[in-house]
Amino acid sequence: MKIIQFVAPLVLLAALTNAQAADGLVAVKSPYSAKVTMDRFELIVKEKGLNVFARIDHAAGAAKVGKALRPTEVLIFGNPQGGTPFMECAQSVGIDLPLKTLVWQDASSQVWLGYNDPMYLAQRHGVADCPAAENLGKALAGFAAAAVAPKPVTP
């Protein structure tokens, strides 16, 4: 347990150091392929008891219409326990829920894991002081950090 208490903040710090936030999008570099990154993220959210509603492979969709797209996948997930308190602050937040994570490979072959910053969403909906946004932000940062961490994620 002491090891987890020591390692977890370091992993989170490393992930946040690599995070970029522009227009509310938090993007974290991944050392894994896009598929492996999304597989890891999906496993983590399922282990945390969240519902996975859909996993959308945009590259596969593009291929169906004769277009080429680098690996790009979206995971749609959530849980009323997290989303409802956010919507209690402003029901309009429902347009941005369930939560989504995007994993993509850029033109330089770097893989990224990105998500909308709940604090940005709270500001967008006029409830910047909503505690649920901060809680969701911490959870998403933790999930992202674990997904890109150099340790095994096992079912």
Where are the model-predicted features located?
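Bacterial N-terminal signal peptides that target proteins for export
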Residues: 1-8
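N-terminal signal peptide c-region/cleavage motif recognized by signal peptidases
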Residues: 14-17
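Terminal, regulation- and interaction-focused segments at domain boundaries
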Residues: 21-49, 145, 149-155
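Soluble non-cytosolic domains of exported or imported proteins
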Residues: 31-36, 53, 130-134
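Stable alpha-helical elements in mature extracytoplasmic
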Residues: 37, 41, 58, 136-139
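Compact, glycine-rich, soluble single-domain proteins
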Residues: 42, 46, 53-99, 103
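Beta-strand/loop substructures that line and gate deep hydrophobic ligand-binding cavities in soluble
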Residues: 100-130
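C-terminal partner/receptor-binding element of secreted or periplasmic proteins
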Residues: 118-155
